Amino acid sequence: MQKTALVIMAAGIGSRFGKGIKQLAPVGTCGEIIMDYSIHDALEAGFNKVVFIIRKDLEEEFRRVIGERIEKITEVEYVFQELDDLPEGFTKPADRTKPWGTGQAVLAAKKVLDEPFIVINADDYYGKEAYVKVHDYLVQEQQKDGKLHICMAGFRLGNTLSDNGSVTRGICHIENGQLTGVTETHDIFKTATGAESRNADGSVQELDVKDLVSMNMWGLTPDFMEVLEKGFAEFLSGDRKSV
């Protein structure tokens, strides 16, 4: 069986509620957390390694709540996303407090990934079919054409809306089956006729519930890390405040 990894991004500060950390909050009848379902679905789809991207200060609680259990059923690695883990020549601004985002999180796992991998958020539920489709893409034989063969799982906007308020989604731009861009769109609400985004200036934009959106589920390869490193350095050279 080909080696493939599930990479779970759980280092984000996220929302704290009650006394716990969002990513570790139980949601199941037997105390399961969302990651339990994600890992179950991923292993069933064929992934055979789990990489947790966490903060160092969360390690003890993370291992206790989920890590030690998962170590009994599959290979597990822990890596740490830190604010000052930046490319050579860059330093963290003194006033920087929030994580740098998905790109830096994935780069934190570079040293433990030699196989194709799927990246997900720790606190999102994706469903079994998404893992199967991404896994099948990652293990299929690709043309030796010098291109990066990577993918993103797209979800119909209407299936990702909440009855309890707004959501933020990445609206996908697709041409001939190829993803050409993703526009992060905030304050998307379900409406009687579909969906709409409400802007800070009071304007409203109607959205098509059939549109594909990103839920931050990516199928990537080790070769992509070099591209990501270069892109992250270029980004840091520009407007850091927008990260």
Residue ranges and their predicted role:
Residues 70-115, 216:
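Short phosphate-binding loop-to-helix
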Residues 62-66, 134, 228:
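Hydrophobic packing residues within well-ordered alpha-helices of enzyme cores
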Residues 115-125:
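Short beta-strand-to-loop acidic/aromatic patch adjacent to the donor-nucleotide binding site
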Residues 128-218:
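Conserved core of the sugar-phosphate nucleotidyltransferase
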Residues 2-67, 73-76, 81:
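N-terminal glycine-rich phosphate-binding loop and ensuing alpha1 helix
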